[in-house]
């Protein structure tokens, strides 16, 4: 059985989602897991009076449980590795599936296209550009887009004039097939993640 299939079946069987599999030099096999997420049901009545519960995260106990089961499964199938590491996603969590984009809509993400933007740039950005950072949104066409402003964020303590005209927002639509890589932007915010724009990297 292929490694991907072994890991997916084992992780899913324990009630977790497989985020990423990495094989590093020296025989390290790194597995990233997350708690399952269910999209909200459209049209379902919501209880406005009920407070939202705290967001759940993968714990050390979760990783230990998956590690034990994976060690057994990998040994049975004779998978060659030196060390197994199971962890939760970091602040730069990869986005690979449609459900990942649904889950993190409104967050700031970094994307890398497989090919330069080319003629679609329409003179607004460098036609050879592949990397973008912006807020993930659902496009009117039903696909996905990121929205950003090239205006640099104010420095700490800097006063921003109320008369200052903000830079226009730009949007880039894309399909998952056009992406080489997509991840949550590694933004450290002690108030918690929230939908907010960010400058696009060069």
Curated annotation (Swiss-Prot):
GO process terms (BP): ribosomal small subunit assembly; translation
Q: Which SUPFAM superfamilies match?
A: YhbC-like, C-terminal domain, YhbC-like, N-terminal domain
Family from the record: Belongs to the RimP family.
Q: Does the keyword Cytoplasm apply?
A: yes
Q: Which PANTHER family match?
A: RIBOSOME MATURATION FACTOR RIMP (PTHR33867:SF1)
What name has this protein been given in UniProt? Ribosome maturation factor RimP
Does the keyword Cytoplasm belong to this entry?
Answer: yes
Q: What does this protein do?
A: Required for maturation of 30S ribosomal subunits.
In the UniProt record, the gene name given for this protein reads rimP
Q: Which residues form a coiled coil?
A: none
| Highest taxon in the source lineage | Bacteria
Alphabetical keyword list: Cytoplasm, Ribosome biogenesis
Under the heading Pfam families, the entry gives: RimP_N
The entry's localization annotation reads: Cytoplasm
Q: One Gene Ontology cellular component annotation? A: cytosol
* Entries under InterPro entries matching the protein: Ribosome_maturation_RimP, RimP_C, RimP_C_sf, RimP_N, RimP_N_sf
Where is it chiefly localized? cytoplasm
């Amino acid at each position: 059985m292929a490694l991907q299939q072994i890991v997916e079946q084992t992780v899913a069987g324990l009630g977790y989602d497989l985020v990423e599999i990495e094989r590093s030099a020296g025989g390290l096999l790194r597995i990233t897991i997350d708690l399952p997420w269910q999209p909200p049901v459209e049209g379902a009545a919501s209880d406005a009076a009920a407070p939202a519960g705290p967001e759940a995260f993968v714990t050390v106990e979760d990783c230990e449980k998956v590690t034990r089961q994976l060690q057994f499964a990998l040994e049975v199938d004779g998978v060659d590795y030196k060390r197994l590491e199971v962890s939760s996603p970091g602040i730069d969590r990869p986005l690979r599936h449609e459900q990942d984009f649904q889950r993190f809509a409104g967050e700031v993400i970094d994307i890398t296209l497989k090919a330069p933007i080319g003629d679609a740039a329409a003179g607004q950005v460098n036609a050879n550009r592949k990397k973008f950072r912006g807020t993930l949104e659902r496009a009117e066409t039903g696909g996905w887009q990121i929205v950003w402003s090239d205006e640099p964020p104010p420095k700490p303590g800097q006063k921003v004039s109320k008369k200052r005209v903000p830079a226009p927002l730009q949007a880039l639509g894309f399909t998952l097939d056009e992406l080489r890589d997509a991840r949550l932007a590694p933004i450290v915010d002690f108030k918690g993640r929230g939908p907010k724009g960010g400058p696009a990297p060069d």
